[in-house]
Regions:
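Catalytic cores of nucleotide-sugar-dependent glycosyltransferases that transfer UDP/GDP/TDP-activated
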Residues: 1-495
Length: 495
């Protein structure tokens, strides 16, 4: 619903299936806490709508009953509660919680059972989330607080814009944020009627997708505007292969799509205050990185040598992350000479090959098969250069963490890696705004060329410090992301 001209601060209903620390399976949970918190600090009236999983209900200090619903004939009775989620000392998020034990009271995961299979009623579970989001964003809401904008996230809330489209009364504008296009929420066509969508919605100009109902396609098709997690990725998804079959529709809606980089928690990722590292430092005393470097070499069993370039990678070990290419490059890197530290888990074949590689050259290569948050901080603080050869990367986080720690990254030119890492181009030898290195072809030779460029720069002390300072000065805060979202909200309120 359009805003009163006298009220500039937007009212936003943020619909999500995850929010940290109550429920999280991946990055969406982090975003759903951090972005609304940053928006509230900028005076936006943002409130969250989340399913009442057991972890949500048990994690809240209080719940106040607001209303009871029988939303659709095929939906169980539902109660809406309100609560608040404390994010930090200064910010708490108002929460609306959908209490429906028949759909959400599950002993295992949010989306999957203990066998790793999708819950068979996921269409109803997240259809209810979407339907409630649409109801609260329309003149049919039982609440006095009505949003100007309903902000939907990934397929789980993708039906909200569709429900709003078929609501004949006043309704909020809708924003659909695409965090992960690979998961599209596809279900058999008989779910259309069960979820209360009209028959005419099941068409190519609607929710139909290769003979099935797709929640994600519905969100893309019906939303007033669309965002995704970096400007380059916003362009990439309009073409194969990164459109995952939706590239045609996304290209049709290109004028409605905006890419906004995710933020990072700059209080957690800050070498000046980091409790996990041996020696704290800032851009004014970068020499302290050497102390961290020697400590990490000792911890990982590498030769202690503060002058040899130390490269690092922290990642899920997978084909998508380019670790098959890194596996080819690692022996060449060790022969330069240079050192390599890797931390991560994933594909078992890659894990075994990387461990074997480290065993053949323990003074130069160290591999830790694990997820270790504290160690990841120490690696960022200690390494000279960070490796990120992802085949595709919608936004990426590790390249932002590394720059915060004065560790220039070497990245494949894709998605958010392009948008967050400024290449040291051959025609700018003084560094200027450069903060890292790009390589373009997804080959070992191209990757190795990028590493070679980095080593040349590393031995140019003045140039290397320029790269470090440039990266550490970049603003990767959630405040920066929130300001970009406020611009989108402003456009939606003017419609």
């Amino acid at each position: 619903m359009s805003s009163s001209p006298s009220r500039k601060n937007p009212r936003v209903l943020f619909v999500t299936s995850e929010v940290f620390p109550l429920c999280k399976t991946g990055g969406l949970g982090d975003v759903s806490a951090a972005l609304p918190a940053a928006l509230r600090e900028l005076k936006a009236d943002v409130r969250l709508l989340v399913p009442g999983y057991p972890s949500v209900l048990s994690g809240l200090k209080y719940k106040r009953k607001l209303a009871e619903f029988d939303l659709l004939p095929h939906f169980p009775p539902t109660t809406l509660f309100s609560s608040r989620l404390q994010i930090n000392e200064s910010v708490s998020l108002p929460l609306y919680v959908i209490h429906c034990p028949e759909l959400y009271q599950r002993p295992d995961g949010i989306y999957l059972d203990d066998d790793g299979q999708d819950w068979p009623d996921n269409a109803q579970r997240f259809g209810l989330l979407s339907k409630m989001g649409a109801l609260l964003a329309s003149d049919a809401s039982p609440l006095s607080w009505i949003p100007d904008i309903v902000h939907c996230n990934d397929w789980q809330s993708g039906l909200t814009p569709a429900y709003l489209h078929y609501h004949s009364g006043k309704k909020a504008a809708s924003l659909m944020t695409l965090h992960n296009l690979a998961f599209q929420g596809c279900f058999p066509p008989d779910e259309v009627a069960r979820l209360g969508l009209p028959p005419e919605s099941f068409s190519v100009h609607g929710v139909e997708y290769y003979g099935n109902l797709s929640f994600l396609k519905a969100g893309i098709y019906y939303a007033t505007r669309i965002t995704t997690v970096s400007p380059t990725y916003a362009r990439e998804i309009q073409h194969e292969p990164l459109g995952f079959g939706l590239q045609g529709l996304l290209a049709e809606r290109s004028n409605a799509i905006t890419g906004i980089i995710n933020g990072i928690d700059t209080t957690v990722w800050n070498p000046a205050t980091d409790p996990h590292i041996v020696k704290k430092y800032s851009s004014r005393n970068l020499a302290a990185k050497r102390i961290n470097k020697l400590a990490l070499q000792r911890e990982m069993g590498l030769e202690e040598n503060e002058t040899i370039p130390l490269f690092a990678g922290i990642s899920r070990l997978s084909y998508q992350k380019g670790y098959d290419i890194l596996l080819q490059v690692a022996p060449m890197l060790a022969d330069l000479p240079a050192q390599l530290v890797l931390l991560g888990k994933g594909d078992q074949s890659l894990e075994k090959q990387l461990v074997m590689l480290a065993q053949t050259n323990p003074a130069r290569i160290a591999v830790r098969i694990d997820y270790d948050e504290a160690l990841s901080h120490r690696i960022n603080a200690s390494a000279d250069c960070f490796l990120m050869p992802s085949r595709f990367e919608p936004c990426g986080l590790n390249q932002m963490y590394s720059q915060r720690y004065g560790t220039p990254p070497i990245v494949h030119t894709t998605g958010g890696l392009i948008d967050t890492v400024t290449d040291l181009a051959p025609d700018t030898p003084a560094g200027e705004s450069a903060s890292g290195f790009h390589f373009h072809e997804m080959t070992a030779d191209a990757f190795m060329n990028g590493i070679g460029r980095a080593i040349d720069a590393y031995y140019n002390t003045r140039l290397w410090k320029t790269l470090q300072h440039n990266g550490m000065r970049k603003d990767f805060s959630w405040r920066s992301s929130a300001l970009a979202y406020l611009s989108i909200y402003s456009l939606l309120m003017q419609r």
